[in-house]
């Protein structure tokens, strides 16, 4: 949750795209809050030269059982949630639970570093690695 000098915005509503947020003129972020994760992990597949994430995935599970999975470096819109993997991990927090999940390639980057299909697969693999590391 993002708190500003004027309002409170959920993270899903705050991030509008790559380098774009829901902030209005004169609005300043005053606080950011999020539930403490009981389990969390991050794995990235770095670009060999820059070391930036070609695809990076963060997985988190709260004590109450809520699960969030986000990917960076793969989407045309910046950070994205991965609902299919979230649902699989909510049912069974294990790397194997992700095996049957198909991550859609729609909206993913397609460039000289990797096709959108390749990035969709990387999201899945990095999510499995992040869960396995917890």
Where are the predicted features?
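C-terminal structural segment of proteins
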Residues: 1-134
């Amino acid at each position: 949750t993002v708190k500003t000098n004027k309002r409170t915005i959920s993270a899903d509503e705050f991030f509008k795209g790559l380098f774009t947020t829901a902030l209005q003129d004169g609005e300043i972020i005053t606080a950011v809050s999020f539930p403490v994760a009981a389990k969390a992990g991050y794995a990235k597949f770095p670009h060999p030269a820059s070391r930036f994430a070609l695809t990076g995935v963060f997985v988190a599970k709260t004590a109450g059982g809520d699960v969030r999975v986000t990917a960076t470096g793969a989407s045309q819109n910046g950070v994205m949630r991965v609902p299919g993997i979230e649902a699989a991990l909510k049912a069974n927090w294990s790397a194997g639970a992700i095996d049957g999940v198909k991550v859609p390639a729609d909206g993913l980057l397609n460039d000289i570093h990797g096709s959108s299909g390749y990035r969709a697969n990387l999201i899945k693999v990095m999510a499995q690695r992040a869960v396995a590391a917890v």
